[in-house]
Amino acid sequence: MKSPFNELSTGSGYFWRGFPLLNHPGIRRYVIAPLLINTLLFAALIYFGAEKFDALLDSLIPAWLDWLRWLLWPIFAILSLFVVFFLFSWVGNLVAAPFNSLLAEAVQARLTGVSPDTNTGWLGFARDIAVSFLPAVLSELRKISYFLLRAIPIGLLLLVPGINIVVPFLWLAFSAWMLAIEYSDYPMGNQGLSFPEQRRRLNGRRMLSFGFGAMVLLATMVPGLNLLVIPTAVAGATVMWVEEHDRK
């Protein structure tokens, strides 16, 4: 039996083991498609936001204060970067949800040698995405409700003197747990495991789960790396499922 420290270390390592799997044939398209959609979405939002911001400056700043634009545009650029940094992974989870189950399936096929019953070619790829769309959205809504039912009470603890000093640490632990649930849902859901059963499995290897979730949380805070956190975490969670949970 592994020590808690070894479990944490092993769990964190599974995130990084997902990264080299992303470039394999048959897996790559499930990474590129949602990343491209998410990038185009944010690019469009920033473009239209810049147009509206420029129009706002035209209406508010008189000609003799035109030099203020040189101060305000860098502020807009910095705020845009903050929005992308903090929201990219969150929005990306919603955009990538229909792709992630198929990504987990493709990664598991790569690891086990058992081919999934998915269609080949781009037409089949589009059909698979369409079929998985509704179940993926329902799964995300279920996880969001689970998150809110626990996040709100934790947030309310901030109002309690004395206890509020431990809330940041509690929030970090809860975030790591939620990320383990978020990404383990894809390989486990592919096997037909219910949400309560998924949580039971993860809770049975709690330190392993926390190690994985903590590394995902850390990676989301690194600019650049956070763009690939979602597919890497899905692939890593699938490796963790195959090696640690599938035998149970």
Give residue ranges: language-model regions.
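Juxtamembrane helix-loop transition sites at the ends of transmembrane segments
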Residues: 41, 47, 59, 196, ...
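Selective recognition of hydrophobic, aromatic-rich stretches within alpha-helical transmembrane segments
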Residues: 73-109, 158-190, 224-247
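Nonpolar helix-loop interface/hinge motif
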Residues: 9-22, 166-212, 227
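Short alpha-helical linear motifs
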Residues: 55-60, 191-196, 236-239
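Helix-coil boundary and N-terminal low-complexity module in membrane systems
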Residues: 1-147, 151, 204-209, 213-216, ...
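Hydrophobic alpha-helical segments
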Residues: 201, 205, 221, 243-247
